[in-house]
Design a protein with these regions (language model features):
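Membrane-topology segments of multi-pass transport proteins
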Residues: 2-172
Length: 173
C-alpha cells in the first residue's frame, strides 16, 4: 500500500469515506427493512444514515488522534533505549543529538556515519512503518466495528433522530 495511505491525512480520508459509505448503506438498509416488514420507520432515512456515520467516524477519529499523539514519544523512547544499549559509553548530553541523526538517517536525509547508526536508522524506520501499519489497521477496525454496531442496532422501530440529536446536544453543549 502507498505510504500516503498510512499518514494522518490518508487515514482520515479512509474513515471519512467509511462514514459516507455507512450513511448510504444504513439509510437504504432501513428503508428496505421497512418495506419488507411493512412497518413505518420512526425516523427519516437520513437519521439512520447519520447514526451509522457517527458510529463509524467518531470512535475511529478519536483513536486516530490518540494514536497520533502517543506514537512519537513512544518511538523516541524505544529508539533511545536501543541507542543506550548500542552505545552505553555515550554521554547523556549527546543522546538527543544522536536520536535526531537516527531520524535523519531513517528519512534518508543523511548517510550513516558508522554501522551502529545505520542499524539504528533501519530499526527506527522499521518501527515507524510498523506503527503506521498498526495505526491504520486499528483505526479501520474500530471504524468497521462502529459500523457493525450501528447496523446491528438499526431497525425501523429504532428512534435514530432522537439518538442523533442527543449525541449532538452532548457533544456541543
Amino acid at each position: 500500500m502507498p505510504a500516503q495511505l498510512f499518514s494522518f491525512g490518508g487515514i482520515l480520508f479512509v474513515i471519512i469515506a467509511l462514514a459516507i459509505g455507512s450513511y448510504f448503506f444504513s439509510s437504504r438498509r432501513v428503508i428496505s427493512q421497512a418495506q419488507a416488514s411493512g412497518i413505518k420507520p420512526h425516523s427519516l432515512g437520513m437519521y439512520y444514515g447519520l447514526y451509522a456515520a457517527i458510529w463509524a467516524f467518531v470512535p475511529a477519529a478519536l483513536l486516530l488522534i490518540a494514536f497520533t499523539g502517543t506514537t512519537k514519544p513512544l518511538l523516541d523512547g524505544l529508539i533511545e533505549q536501543s541507542l543506550i544499549q548500542a552505545a552505553p559509553e555515550l554521554p547523556q548530553s549527546f543522546i538527543p543529538l544522536k536520536i535526531a541523526q537516527i531520524k535523519n538517517i531513517a528519512n534518508g536525509f543523511i548517510e550513516p556515519t558508522d554501522e551502529t547508526m545505520a542499524m539504528l536508522g533501519q530499526e527506527y524506520k522499521a518501527m515507524r512503518d510498523n506503527m503506521g501499519n498498526l495505526r491504520f489497521a486499528a483505526v479501520l477496525m474500530v471504524g468497521l466495528l462502529g459500523l457493525g454496531f450501528a447496523t446491528w442496532r438499526i431497525s425501523p422501530q429504532f428512534k435514530s433522530r432522537i439518538v442523533f440529536e442527543t449525541f449532538l446536544r452532548r457533544a456541543f453543549f
